[in-house]
Amino acid sequence: MEFDLGAALEPTSQKPGVGAGHGGDPKLSPHKVQGRSEAGAGPGPKQGHHSSSDSSSSSSDSDTDVKSHAAGSKQHESIPGKAKKPKVKKKEKGKKEKGKKKEAPH
């Protein structure tokens, strides 16, 4: 398997030459595709499997994700609050000049 992965990595570099050779053999073609997927996504699934094996670690990750989401929500709430303050200042300026006219239709 390691040999296949190594061979799959090499064709990625020598795409024109080796790619044509592999393309000729239907059996090698799917193998190459699988090898490529494993090589490309190898780091991702490997880590995923590790997390899956460690249930406690996976749970901690989930908790961290939830906390991150909560923090993100709070930040989002703060941002609109800050955005409103400048708008209020603009409205105050508008109230002094044209604010009364704008408020009447409102």
From Swiss-Prot:
Residues 82-99 have a biased composition (Basic residues). GO terms for cellular component: cytosol; nucleolus; nucleoplasm; nucleus; plasma membrane. Residues 64-79 have a biased composition (Basic and acidic residues). The modification Phosphoserine is found at residue 29. Residues 1-106 are annotated as: Disordered. Transmembrane segments: none annotated. InterPro entries: IMUP. The keyword Acetylation applies. The modification N-acetylmethionine is found at residue 1. Keywords: Acetylation, Nucleus, Phosphoprotein. It is found in: Nucleus. This is Immortalization up-regulated protein.
